[in-house]
Amino acid sequence: MSRIGKRPIPIPNKVTIDIQGQHVAVKGPKGSLERTLPDKVNVVQENDTLLVQREDDSRTARERHGLTRTLVANMVEGVSKGFEKRLSIQGVGYRAQVQGTKLTLNVGYSKPVEMTMPAGIQVAVENNTLVIVSGIDKEIVGNVSAEIRAVRPPEVYKGKGIRYSDEFVRRKAGKTGKK
């Protein structure tokens, strides 16, 4: 039995779950999410918890058991609390601005980099150097954050670039030269 897959998912108040075959819809105060489950895995609602069960012990069913449980748990957490990623911009003259759904990054290129945010994603900027990406879908929040970081990843000599706020960038010593 999958250690992750057999753990029950608690359903918070104000969250409703609609299960129709392999289709799961979760609605909460922050919004609603839908997902089609993979084959050989079922979700069962018991009182105020969800249980993910597999049909048999085949390899594919065991592979998908823990994955499905985590995906459904992320849906429940997303519609109740939401997800947030923080990115820090470091470097002289590097800054970010938000105009509606557009994020503009000035990170040392000849022209500013403009990014349009997908639906359901909110972006905020604090002090021109801290970008906060938030939304209800953990996968989209992570992908958008990775795209923003990829515009100018942190470099190892001076540490300039865009990094996650909790990321540690390993620094390298530069050339020492002849003496």
Swiss-Prot record:
GO terms for biological process: cytoplasmic translation. Disulfide bonds: none annotated. GO terms for molecular function: rRNA binding; structural constituent of ribosome. One of its GO terms (cellular component) is cytosolic large ribosomal subunit. Keywords: Ribonucleoprotein, Ribosomal protein, RNA-binding, rRNA-binding. InterPro entries: Ribosomal_uL6-like, Ribosomal_uL6-like_a/b-dom_sf, Ribosomal_uL6_a/b-dom, Ribosomal_uL6_bac-type, Ribosomal_uL6_CS. The keyword Membrane does not apply. SUPFAM superfamilies: Ribosomal protein L6 (SSF56053). Pfam families: Ribosomal_L6. Signal peptide: none annotated. This protein binds to the 23S rRNA, and is important in its secondary structure. It is located near the subunit interface in the base of the L7/L12 stalk, and near the tRNA binding site of the peptidyltransferase center. Belongs to the universal ribosomal protein uL6 family. Part of the 50S ribosomal subunit. PANTHER family: 60S/50S RIBOSOMAL PROTEIN L6/L9 (PTHR11655), LARGE RIBOSOMAL SUBUNIT PROTEIN UL6M (PTHR11655:SF14). This is Large ribosomal subunit protein uL6.
